[in-house]
Regions:
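Hydrophobic alpha-helical membrane-association signature
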Residues: 18-21, 79-82, 226
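Crotonase-fold acyl-CoA enzyme core
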Residues: 88-202
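Glycine- (often His-adjacent) and acidic-residue-rich active-site loop
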Residues: 10, 40-85
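Hydrophobic alpha-helical segments typical of transmembrane helices
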Residues: 82-86, 142-145, 154, 206, ...
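Terminal peptide-recognition signature
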Residues: 3, 7, 21-22, 38, ...
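C-terminal alpha-helix plus adjacent terminal tail
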Residues: 1, 29, 45, 58, ...
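Catalytic-core regions built around general acid/base machinery
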Residues: 25-28, 82-94
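Conserved CoA-thioester-binding segment of acyl-CoA-metabolizing enzymes
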Residues: 1-41
Length: 244
């Protein structure tokens, strides 16, 4: 299954209605979906938040962010919650999520790429977390996966400076799984998807939550998670072989 951002004329700039739609898609995935690709049309994955959202009155059909911010911190906090779900939901879904990223992935675009489990990037990719340079912070569920990928110090440096990270550096610091020429991005992503689909589905479905648990579990807790997961898998294999 592929979810594609399709506003290339605006460099796939994002608005809140898109975030709500992303959440709906993640929540509604069919049981038989094993891999999801997050992709984008055009020369850029996403240039981030549409700056029109930061103008007085906002954009037609979208919530007025400045009006909510002026009302109270609590009003803005409540407004942001459902928007974050468009990103955080992809970290929780059962399928493996792969982002195919070309060109700009800035701010919200960077955070959408971080919502994926794996990132394949084109050699023209430019990651940047620009929120701090605008007087804000990254707030679309991107801070945890960023720190997981590159560590606290590097995450602080990237967010505080807002500098651009290219393909080779992204691979070197753990932001990207691999980098390929832009013309090979789709084919390489398809090859990765086929490799993932070639694994036994029950094992792949058990692996993702197991590794996520390892991020916060103690070693004693994690070995329990491992043996419980393995017990279920081996029991299923035995039953499939006609044993009881």
């Amino acid at each position: 299954m592929t979810v594609t951002l399709c506003n290339p004329d605006q460099l796939n700039a994002q608005v809140p209605s898109m975030w709500l739609a992303l959440a709906d898609i993640a929540h509604g995935l069919a049981e038989d979906v094993r891999v999801v690709v997050l992709a984008a049309e055009g020369r850029s994955f996403s240039a981030g938040l549409n700056r029109g959202m930061l103008r007085p009155g906002g954009m037609p059909g979208e919530p007025d962010l400045l009006a909510a911010a002026a009302q109270s911190p609590e009003a803005m906090t409540a407004l942001i919650g459902p928007f974050q779900e468009g990103f955080a939901a992809w970290r929780r879904v059962a399928p493996v999520v792969v982002a195919a990223v070309q060109g700009h992935a800035i701010g919200a675009g960077f955070q959408l790429a971080l919502a994926a489990d794996l990132r394949v990037v084109a050699d023209d990719v430019k990651f940047a977390m620009r929120e701090v340079s605008l007087g804000m912070i990254p707030d679309l569920a991107g801070t945890r996966p960023l720190v997981e990928a590159v560590g606290y110090s590097r995450a602080l440096e990237l967010c505080a400076t807002g500098r651009f990270v290219g393909a080779d550096e992204a691979v070197g610091m753990g932001l990207a799984t691999l980098a390929v020429p832009v013309g090979e991005l789709a084919a390489t992503t398809a090859d990765l998807v086929q490799a993932l689909l070639g694994t036994p589905p029950t094992a792949l479905r058990a692996l993702k939550p197991l590794l996520n648990q390892a991020l916060t579990a103690t070693i004693d807790e994690q070995v329990v998670h491992e043996r419980v997961a393995q017990g279920h898998l081996l029991h299923g294999m035995a039953r499939a072989a006609g044993l009881s």
